[in-house]
Amino acid sequence: MEAPRGWLVIMISVLAVSLASSAAQDTCRDLDGRDGAARKPGRPGRPGPKGERGEPGAPAFQTGIRGLKGDQGESGSPGKPGRMGYPGPSGPPGLPGLPGLKGIKGNPGNIKDQRRPAFSAVRQNPPTSGNVVIFDEVITNQEGAYKSQLGQFICDVPGYYYFTFQVVSKWDLCLYIMSSRRDQVQQSLGFCDFNSKGLFQVVSGGTVLQLQRGDKVWIQRDPNKGRIYQGSEADSVFSGFLIFPST
């Protein structure tokens, strides 16, 4: 491209001034000339290289309207297993299990080691007051469960017992086999005999009772029909024994 004439004139002027200045330095400095006339700006130069990245700017204030919620993104990859939590509350009981196998047969028991309470007592010189029939003369009292002063059997071995009585009378007579637990009456079995001729008759009765430790058993008479014969001609007896213990 051919350079404009204006540029050539300027370049020749600058070159002449430089040569004159150089010649003056060898001899003596002359007075500076006047500034040249101002010219029009030249054309823009070519773009320079890309500059370095600047510092981040301050956060801008949100001025626009908030847009709509976007679509749900894809699920991320599973995270690592967490720590074991605290034990939870106990669940409900499970169903009963299947019956176990039959155990090995045990050694035979020793009948001598088994307790076998039993008693039998008759009336000889009992007290006349009260409604409890006292059988004061003991015939047998295995393990001492019968208390002759009270007329009561007090259970010490839980199980099933058989009790029986035979009482002689010449009058109308009603008797009861009584049992109590913690001083509360549990059973009351009545047996009556009506005697209009005044002859010797025997009133008898018996029963099987399941007893726990501390239960009491005795014979009790009706206050209005409770006269018992007392003499050497006939005896009245009260007996009882353990049939088998409770398991």
Swiss-Prot record:
GO cellular component: collagen trimer; extracellular region
Residues with glycosylation annotation: K50, K69, K102
Any Pfam family the entry gives: C1q
Record-linked SMART domains: C1Q
InterPro entries per record: C1q_dom, Collagen, Collagen/C1q_domain, Tumour_necrosis_fac-like_dom
Domain (Collagen-like): residue spans on this chain: 33-111
Positions bound to Ca(2+): Q201
Disulfide bonds: C174-C192
Residues bearing the modification 5-hydroxylysine: K50, K69, K102
Annotated segments matching region Disordered: 26-116
Notes on how activity is controlled: The C1Q subcomplex is inhibited by sulfated molecules, such as triterpenoid sulfates, heparan sulfate, or chondroitin sulfates.
Annotated Basic and acidic residues bias: 27-38
GO biological process: complement activation, classical pathway; innate immune response
The entry's keywords: Calcium, Collagen, Complement pathway, Disulfide bond, Glycoprotein, Hydroxylation, Immunity, Innate immunity, Metal-binding, Repeat, Secreted, Signal
Residues the record lists as 4-hydroxyproline modifications: P41, P47, P56, P59, P81, P87
Statement: the UniProt record of this protein carries the keyword Magnesium: no
Residue ranges, compositional bias (Low complexity): 98-109
Cellular localisation: Secreted; Cell surface
PTM note: O-linked glycans are assumed to be the Glc-Gal disaccharides typically found as secondary modifications of hydroxylated lysines in collagen-like domains.
Signal peptide start-end: 1-24
Quaternary context: Core component of the complement C1 complex, a calcium-dependent complex composed of 1 molecule of the C1Q subcomplex, 2 molecules of C1R and 2 molecules of C1S. The C1Q subcomplex is composed 18 subunits: 3 chains of C1QA, C1QB, and C1QC trimerize to form 6 collagen-like triple helices connected to six globular ligand-recognition modules (C1q domain). Interacts with CR1 (via Sushi 24 and Sushi 25 domains). Interacts (via C-terminus) with CD33; this interaction activates CD33 inhibitory motifs.
Function: Core component of the complement C1 complex, a multiprotein complex that initiates the classical pathway of the complement system, a cascade of proteins that leads to phagocytosis and breakdown of pathogens and signaling that strengthens the adaptive immune system.
The record's note on its domains: The C1q domain is the ligand-recognition domain, which specifically recognizes and binds the Fc regions of IgG or IgM immunoglobulins. The collagen-like domain interacts with C1R and C1S proenzymes.
Protein's recorded name: Complement C1q subcomponent subunit A
